Regions:
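Sec-exported extracytoplasmic/periplasmic mature domains
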Residues: 130, 145, 161, 173-177, ...
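Amphipathic, coiled-coil-like alpha-helical scaffolding segments used for oligomerization/assembly
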Residues: 157-217
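Terminal targeting segments of Actinobacterial cell-envelope proteins
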Residues: 1-51
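Extracytoplasmic
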Residues: 93-96, 118-123, 132-140, 151, ...
Length: 355
């Protein structure tokens, strides 16, 4: 009887002690009535879990960033390069000037000219100020009569058609005195893809027109890729009017890229940069980092703060020529990061909102 009492007391004590131990599981009792305590599980501290999650996320971001950088570098490396003479070296601490042309293909070339990448109606000097910010864009109409070195007086587009980018750079440098540091060409065959990549672009048209069967109404028009090209290449317009539309299209496209940060947003950067690089040809002196930097700086040309102007012209003996009384101030303004100041002084040269 004493043995039974002792055994019962011992079991009761063990049971009581077991109740006090963390981790006992009453449901784990064996058929003999014995209890097997489950191992104690240490609670993970929330901050440790957060660190693990954060570390994994950062690792993923870095991997994506590294892959994105490699892909961007691949895109930039694939941009065609062209040898261009007469380019001025970049002076440290000073601004840079780029000559942009737009290769023209399709039914709107002047009679007798064969469509080629060396025919352009758009000649745009884009200036980056010494502080790295976009200074503005200056368009010289392609049908302006200028002195083409070694060829006499011809429309500006003649220089590009006859001697390629080198003669175009030489001609504009001779006429303006502005050193040109780099050259880039936009291929209108790929403008549609670029416009589609940014989700279309809005332009304002002063009166209803029709081009290639596409009707454009007066006011704001939302253009897709193909309709943007139709808008810029309308054969019913004069060459000067088409040049103005191309200038407006470039301005409004860059405005959307810059204002919506499409080149810095990871969700849009690759598609936009892919379309942009597909449309570009640059001079062989431009490094990949310079091309990437240029793409970002071009975004700075977007918005109301951007300055787009057209060189002043006048008719002399029925021919379109530059107006030196005004344009000489413009050339000086480009060299001294003063395009905005020039535009304020000569508002009539500012590119209109509607074209």
């Amino acid at each position: 009887m004493s043995d039974i009492t002792d055994t019962t007391s011992q079991a009761s004590a063990e049971s009581s002690a077991g109740d006090e131990r963390s981790g006992d599981d009453r449901s784990s009792a064996t058929h003999h009535g014995e209890y097997r305590p489950t191992p104690h599980r240490r609670k993970r501290r929330p901050w440790r879990v957060a660190l693990v999650v954060l570390g994994s996320f950062l690792g993923l971001v870095l991997a994506v960033a590294a892959g994105g950088y490699a892909y961007v570098n691949h895109l930039v490396s694939s941009i065609p390069r062209v040898n261009v003479a007469y380019l001025a070296p970049v002076t440290p601490g000073s601004g840079q000037t780029f000559l942009f042309t737009a290769s023209a293909y399709g039914p709107t070339e002047p009679s007798g000219l064969t469509p080629s990448p060396n025919y352009s109606e758009l000649f745009m000097l884009i200036h980056i100020n010494a502080n790295g910010k976009a200074g503005g864009a200056v368009t010289i109409p392609g049908d302006t009569i200028v002195n083409v070195p070694g060829h006499g007086s011809h429309p500006l587009y003649y220089a590009l058609k006859t001697g390629g980018p080198s003669l175009a750079v030489h001609t504009i440098t001779t006429v303006t005195g502005v050193p040109i540091n780099h050259y880039a060409r936009i291929d209108f065959n790929h403008v549609a893809g670029l416009v589609n990549a940014i989700g279309g672009v809005q332009v304002t048209i002063p009166k209803a027109t029709t081009a290639f069967g596409q009707t454009f109404h007066a006011g704001v028009n939302q253009l897709t890729g193909v309709t943007a090209v139709y808008y810029a290449r309308d054969p019913s317009l004069s060459q000067s009017a088409r040049t103005l539309r191309q200038e407006v299209l470039v301005r409004d496209t860059l405005a959307k890229i810059g204002n919506e940060h499409l080149l810095t947003n990871p969700l849009t950067m690759v598609s936009v940069l892919n379309a942009l690089t597909s449309a570009l040809t640059v001079d062989s002196n431009m490094t990949n980092s310079e091309v990437t930097s240029l793409a970002k700086q071009l975004g700075g040309l977007g918005g109301s703060a951007a300055t787009f102007v057209t060189a002043a012209t006048q008719k002399v003996n029925g021919k379109l020529v530059l107006n030196p009384a005004i344009d000489n101030q413009l050339w000086t303004a480009i060299e001294h990061d003063g395009i905005a100041g020039f535009a304020a002084k000569y508002p009539s040269t500012v590119t209109p909102q509607a074209a």
